[in-house]
Amino acid sequence: MGTHPVKGRTGFTLAKVCKAHRGNVGELLAAHGLHVGQEMVLVELWESDGLRGGELAVRLGVEPPTITKMLRRLEGCGLVERRPDPSDARSFRVYLTDDGRALEGPVTGCWELSEERLLAGMGEEDRRTFHELLVRVRGNLDSCSAAE
Amino acid sequence: MGTHPVKGRTGFTLAKVCKAHRGNVGELLAAHGLHVGQEMVLVELWESDGLRGGELAVRLGVEPPTITKMLRRLEGCGLVERRPDPSDARSFRVYLTDDGRALEGPVTGCWELSEERLLAGMGEEDRRTFHELLVRVRGNLDSCSAAE
DNA sequence: ACCATTTAGTTAGCCGGCTAACTAAAAGCT
DNA sequence: AGCTTTTAGTTAGCCGGCTAACTAAATGGT
């Protein structure tokens, strides 16, 4: 018996951490009527409003159909607005509404709270190390998916 | 302009790493006809065949309806078999088929390969540190969801 | 013995993801 | 100009997740 060898792998633990973290963030975001994943769209728009749909997909690292559906829902919630791109009739640009802008503070707070839970009991040193390692690992994954 | 502050947070980076990692594993598993997530069910069964549905849900940290649907699909693929539990008429037990058992090697290989990509260019020391930190973080997340 | 309560799974329906196949507009080539 | 190719988004449909509401069997209290 004993546990399966795969369970001891770093990748396996990472997958479990991800799942838990996503659930954690999702729980906090739900209080603001958001589903986990949608906040990523908002972050990009808070950073630069008026992006085109395709640009959003690239920045989120997501396929176009995902953006189509998410925007439909975010628009339905009145957080976002789609306006045609004057310079390209196939395209559109996404703008935050007042409600969408108003979520910046609360959602940022959710991220901060969830991060405090994530790193609870860890010192500055470990936190920095963890962050650095995550950034390196992210670079690995990005470059390997780009190489395809 | 500059990037939004949320993007600099450890939790944000973690979310991105997760997404990329999941995609990475998913790509490898697809070669064996599996969707990412399904392999978790198989891991539990390789470890202890004949689990009840509810027990599977607990081990995967997933809600019962998720198990219902996944098992229906895995059964449809012929990887798994559901037999009634003789001691409880509401319950059933899940058993691997020969095909399900045959996937153990290949799927383990997928995890190993994806882990090599994940940790590429990192030394033993960093790998160990990263693993330890992930385990601690996982403990944090588990305990906070259990406290609810 | 009986009824209320808890427990095990299912169904329906939503959301974030994906791929495949499509439409329509823009860009390029001749 | 006219035709081909590329690009931008959409639709349909699948999968892993979730919640809410339900069925049916086991358990517990009296």
Q: Where do the model's predicted regions map?
A:
Chain A
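Pre-recognition alpha-helix immediately N-terminal to the DNA-recognition helix
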Residues: 9, 13, 24, 40-46, ...
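Charged, amphipathic alpha-helical coiled-coil/dimerization segments
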Residues: 22, 72-135, 139
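N-terminal leader segment of winged-helix/HTH proteins
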Residues: 1-32, 148
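Residues within the alpha-helical elements of helix-turn-helix
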Residues: 44, 59, 77
